[in-house]
């Protein structure tokens, strides 16, 4: 009994520690930039006890930090869901092409219809992601397909989408600078408007994810077991993938194509909390938020006032890890 209690406490302790790390990093990150602000000055400002750097913190840095936390958590949760549903450790929104699909659709709105209202972006991004997801589901229905093959199929679809983005930048050069910044994945210039754009989506989707947590554990065990317990496996798979696509699409629409968070975060979380979705999903979301926050902070702090896009830094970390996973899966097979 005591051993069981200890095992249950370990994942909860890991989640608590991750939450504390995220809070501490957020305070530090707010202070880093062309003008350094000490952590104690940040805290006193946030508590309303000091107004020395109020404009910089409240209007420039705080919305950016909140957006990094929201987007990182959303992308990581989407990756954890996809890995559980597809039962593929290589699955993540960017690896299987979902992020590229949403990116292509969002860029079409940015370049072809520049006068479109900003709230159109998440819907267009979701539509693009959904098309890629449907194509992947058609590929995944082949029972003989290996995890590495599905990942490579996603990479191929992503390459096609990326080629489409490059073509649009050549064809519609008017807003190409904004498109390039968005394409690399960056939080530069983001403000409360983007927070207001992304937050409602996540406020709707995260409660849905919480409701679906027991179903995700069921799906990870296989379709036959799910059917035996009275669940419609195909319908459940559709709902879970729909939720993951909506999470990824809304995040990509606002912060651009930031890669590998959906791949890295669930793998790190699995080592800390195990496979149970009730621990894995919140841990993944927290780790995803931490990764994107660190990437954005480093991007601002390495060469101020010049900024390195967060998407470049996540790619530098994530690409070697993806190659390692690809090699590991090939050895298993």
Swiss-Prot record:
Gene3D superfamilies referenced in this protein's UniProt entry, alphabetically: ABC transporter involved in vitamin B12 uptake, BtuC (1.10.3470.10)
SUPFAM superfamilies the UniProt entry points to: ABC transporter involved in vitamin B12 uptake, BtuC (SSF81345)
Keywords on record: Cell membrane, Ion transport, Iron, Iron transport, Membrane, Transmembrane, Transmembrane helix, Transport
Main location: membrane
Gene Ontology biological-process annotations: siderophore-dependent iron import into cell
InterPro entries noted in UniProt: ABC_BtuC-like, ABC_transptr_permease_BtuC
Keyword Glycoprotein listed: no
Listed GO MF terms: transmembrane transporter activity
Membrane topology annotation: Multi-pass membrane protein
Superkingdom of this protein's organism: Bacteria
PANTHER family: FE(3+) DICITRATE TRANSPORT SYSTEM PERMEASE PROTEIN FECD-RELATED, FERRIC ENTEROBACTIN TRANSPORT SYSTEM PERMEASE PROTEIN
Similarity comment: family membership: Belongs to the binding-protein-dependent transport system permease family. FecCD subfamily.
Name recorded for this polypeptide: Fe(3+)-citrate import system permease protein YfmE
């Amino acid at each position: 009994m005591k051993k069981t209690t200890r095992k249950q406490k370990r994942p909860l302790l890991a989640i608590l520690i991750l939450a504390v790390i995220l809070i501490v990093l957020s305070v530090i990150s707010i202070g880093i930039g062309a003008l350094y602000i000490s952590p104690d000055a940040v805290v006193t400002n946030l508590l309303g006890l000091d107004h020395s750097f109020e404009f910089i913190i409240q209007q420039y840095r705080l919305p950016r930090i909140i957006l990094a936390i929201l987007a990182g958590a959303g992308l990581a949760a989407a990756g954890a869901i996809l890995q559980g549903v597809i039962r593929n450790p290589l699955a993540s929104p960017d690896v299987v092409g979902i992020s590229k699909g949403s990116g292509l659709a969002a860029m079409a709105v940015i370049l072809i219809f520049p006068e479109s209202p900003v709230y159109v972006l998440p819907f267009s991004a979701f539509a693009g992601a959904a098309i890629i997801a449907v194509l992947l589901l058609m590929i995944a229905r082949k029972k003989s397909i290996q995890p590495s093959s599905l990942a490579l199929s996603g990479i191929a679809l992503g390459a096609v989408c990326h080629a489409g983005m490059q073509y649009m930048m050549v064809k519609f050069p008017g807003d190409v600078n904004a498109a390039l910044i968005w394409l690399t994945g960056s939080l530069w210039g983001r403000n409360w408007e983007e927070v207001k754009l992304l937050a409602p989506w996540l406020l709707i989707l995260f409660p849905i994810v919480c409701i679906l947590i027991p179903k995700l554990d069921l799906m990870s065990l296989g379709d036959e077991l799910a059917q035996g317990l009275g669940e419609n496996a195909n319908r459940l798979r559709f709902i879970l993938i729909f939720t993951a696509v909506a999470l990824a699409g809304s995040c990509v629409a606002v912060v651009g194509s930031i890669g590998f968070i959906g791949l890295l975060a669930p793998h790190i979380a699995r080592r800390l909390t195990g496979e149970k979705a009730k621990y894995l999903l919140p841990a993944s979301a927290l780790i995803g938020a931490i990764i994107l926050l660190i990437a954005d902070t480093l991007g601002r702090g390495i060469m101020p006032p010049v900024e390195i896009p967060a998407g470049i830094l996540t790619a530098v970390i994530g690409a070697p890890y993806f190659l390692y996973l690809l090699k590991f899966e090939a050895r298993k097979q």
